């Protein structure tokens, strides 16, 4: 007999950089089965399951080729497949990689200071003040075994206490005397 296997793999050009922000892909979740079937998907389709992959699924998915099976079991191409759209981000990958490098350096430097036993993670977000575009977004945690975890999602999913009440006043003065 003949067997077939469907497989897929997402390749991340920069390793774990922004991997969590991009999101994940996989099989259609059971709880969303009807939604996807009504939208023309097949149960074997791979879909975006989180973050950017899920948010922009309808633009990223593309379409499959369509064939006619002839009476002699040959195939006739009826409709070409269409590649999905590319999603262009405002992230500057060179700045992104530099920010990640700086975060790692600063966390490691923290070991040389007293009372930093709990300093295991840091976050950074750089945006263009004129457009609001995000240039770099990063969060890294140093694990107890010395490995690093990407926790970039915390920059948008976690709440933070402000560092100083004076900072708000400083910003307000800056606005007043622009």
What are these regions (language model features)?
Residues 3-5, 20-24, 88-90, 123-127, ...:
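Soluble periplasmic/extracytoplasmic beta-strand elements of cell-envelope proteins
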Residues 11, 46, 88-96:
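Generic detection of long, well-ordered alpha-helical segments
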Residues 31-36, 75-83, 93-166, 173-178:
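Short pre-catalytic segments that frame enzyme active sites
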Residues 1-84:
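Small/polar-residue-rich segments within soluble enzyme cores
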């Amino acid at each position: 007999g003949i067997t077939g296997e469907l497989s897929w793999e997402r390749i991340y050009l920069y390793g774990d950089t922004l991997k969590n922000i991009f999101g994940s892909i996989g099989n259609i979740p059971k709880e969303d089965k009807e939604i996807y079937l009504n939208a023309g998907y097949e149960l074997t389709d791979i879909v975006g399951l989180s973050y950017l992959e899920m948010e922009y699924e309808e633009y990223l998915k593309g379409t499959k080729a369509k064939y006619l099976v002839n009476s002699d079991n040959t195939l006739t191409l009826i409709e070409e497949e269409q590649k999905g759209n590319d999603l262009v981000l405002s992230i500057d990958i060179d700045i992104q990689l530099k920010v990640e490098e700086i975060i790692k350096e600063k966390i490691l430097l923290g070991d040389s200071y007293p009372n930093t036993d709990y300093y295991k993670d840091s976050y950074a977000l750089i945006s263009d003040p004129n457009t609001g575009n995000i240039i770099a977004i990063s969060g890294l945690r140093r694990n107890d075994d010395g490995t690093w975890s990407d926790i970039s999602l915390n920059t948008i999913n976690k709440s933070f206490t402000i560092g100083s009440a004076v900072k708000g006043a400083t910003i307000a003065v800056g606005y007043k005397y622009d």
